[in-house]
Design a protein with these regions (language model features):
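Canonical Rossmann dinucleotide-binding motif of NAD(H)/NADP(H)-dependent dehydrogenases/reductases
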Residues: 2-37
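Active-site helix of classical SDR
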Residues: 139, 176, 184
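Residue(s) in the substrate-gating loop at a strand-loop-helix junction
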Residues: 160
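Short, small/polar-rich loop/turn modules that mediate ligand/substrate recognition or access, typified
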Residues: 192, 197, 263-265
Length: 277
């Protein structure tokens, strides 16, 4: 413990209990970081119910992390598609906590499962806006803060194994995550001379709240119940189980720590061997 002591980490899309963002924020706090968690909050109610955390749930996540880690945890509302929101959250983080060391671009949408011929333009656009525009905006506006501080920084993008292999009925999601790998590599090349590392983590299926929705939808498509979907997923994984939130969170801790100081531009598979390139 203590690998991130006194660091300040900002994690987007962390306003849901049992979500990846909550798990990442908790692990960072356990390692000594001061943490800022964001989510879209109540403005996200125009999106499908149950997939977007409310303002109250975001604060509940923050309280939960404080309770088990005794760390500083701030919660802020942010629509990652909004440049003004992104700038405001970064500015508030530096004002409140005095610095910014780590950004984890975790906010993402993956609930729409349709063949290309049935996808609407609105469905395509919202996935690309959240999954790719959001990380672009946080990279764009966090990098100058890192440069001004003078001691580098870490940007970690939560991608997916769908960033490396075809994902039928997820053309929008897969395209956004392939694009995120491109952004990761390009930003790493541009920002490395400032001591800024930029990496991606590529999990396979993780049964979060969103993952449960995906399993239900997959079951409808495949004509099986959720347990059948999980058995099918496990059959493709050499280590024999689906991913856990802690698997992804631990990878993020590593990439944000001094142990990964010489690693940048990489996309780290966290998939139990399901993805091997």
């Amino acid at each position: 413990m203590g690998r991130l002591r006194e660091k300040v980490a900002l994690i987007t899309g962390a306003g849901r209990h049992r979500g990846l963002g909550e798990g990442i924020a908790k692990r960072f706090a356990e390692e000594g970081a001061k943490v800022v968690i964001t989510d879209i909050g109540n403005p996200g109610k125009n999106l499908p119910a149950g997939l977007i955390g409310t303002t109250e749930e975001l604060e509940g996540v923050a309280n939960g992390i404080r309770g088990v880690t005794n760390s500083t945890v701030l919660s802020m509302i942010c629509d990652v598609r909004s440049e003004s929101d992104v700038k405001s959250v970064i500015g508030a983080t530096v004002k409140e906590l005095g610095r910014l060391d780590i950004v984890v671009n975790n906010a993402g949408i993956g609930y729409i499962i349709k063949p290309i011929t049935e996808l609407t333009l609105d469905e395509w656009d919202i996935v690309l806006e959240v999954n790719l525009r959001g990380p672009f905006l946080f990279t764009k506006h966090a990098a100058p803060v890192f440069i001004k501080q003078g001691w580098g920084g870490h940007i970690i993008n939560i991608a997916s194994q769908a960033a490396k292999s075809p994902a039928p009925q997820l053309a929008h999601y897969s395209s956004s995550k392939h694009g995120l790998i491109g952004l990761t590599r390009t930003a790493a090349a541009e920002l490395g001379n400032h001591g800024i590392t930029v990496n991606a983590v590529c999990p396979n299926h993780v049964t979060t709240g969103l993952g449960e929705v995906q399993n239900q939808r997959r079951g409808e498509i495949m004509g099986m119940d959720v347990s059948g979907v999980l058995d099918f997923r496990k059959s493709k994984i050499p280590l024999g189980r689906v991913g856990l939130v802690t698997d992804t969170a631990n990878a993020c801790v590593f990439l944000a720590s001094a142990d990964a100081a010489y690693i940048t531009g990489e996309s780290l598979n966290v998939s139990g061997g399901e993805e091997m390139h």
